[in-house]
Design a protein with these regions (language model features):
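Mid-chain, well-packed structural core segment of small domains
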Residues: 82-87, 91-100
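HotDog/MaoC-like acyl-thioester-processing domains
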Residues: 1-15, 98-103, 107-153
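Hot-dog-fold acyl-thioester-processing enzymes
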Residues: 1-88, 150-153
Length: 153
């Protein structure tokens, strides 16, 4: 038995399959500081506790794009490790804010499969949902990717 995760191939997916991604992630001050430093983001809501409180938050929420990247990354080993390309994203929403100290987890459901005419790959459609430690949905999106098959014709 190999300890290397080979990821899922097109044939490994089935419509309705629910994937609980194994790793949770607690958002740290370091995550937020590095994100702001690397991106140059200066949205006042995400950079200032005072402004966040003036806008009705107890503390500053993290940037939604950072939330997307932290949560989306949880799905890579299970869904897109064998992707030829991520083809698209749709219906992205951030229903609830995420704060430093929150722990997020991710589940994905396969909602569609379409074998490509080349016989070497197929498109996998998934609906992914990220939740915080209280079960509140913090990220909801659909994506589709071109995924390799185990055997190429």
């Amino acid at each position: 038995m190999s300890k290397i995760n080979m990821g899922n191939f097109f044939e490994d997916f089935s419509i309705g399959q629910k994937i609980v991604h194994p790793l949770t992630r607690t958002v740290s001050e370091g995550d937020v500081s590095l994100y702001i430093a690397f991106t140059g983001s200066r949205f006042a809501l995400h950079s200032s506790d005072v402004i966040a409180q003036e806008m009705g938050y107890e503390k500053r929420p993290i940037d939604d794009v950072l939330m997307f990247h932290l949560t989306f990354g949880k799905s890579v080993q299970d869904i897109s490790l064998n992707a030829i390309a991520n083809l698209g994203y749709a219906e992205i929403s951030f229903p609830n804010p995420v704060f430093i100290g929150d722990t997020v987890s991710m589940t994905s459901t396969v909602i569609g499969l379409k074998e490509n005419s080349n016989g070497k790959s197929g498109v996998v459609y998934v609906h992914s949902i990220g939740v915080n430690q209280n079960g509140a949905v913090v990220l909801d999106f659909k994506k589709w990717l071109d995924c390799m098959k185990h055997t190429k014709l």
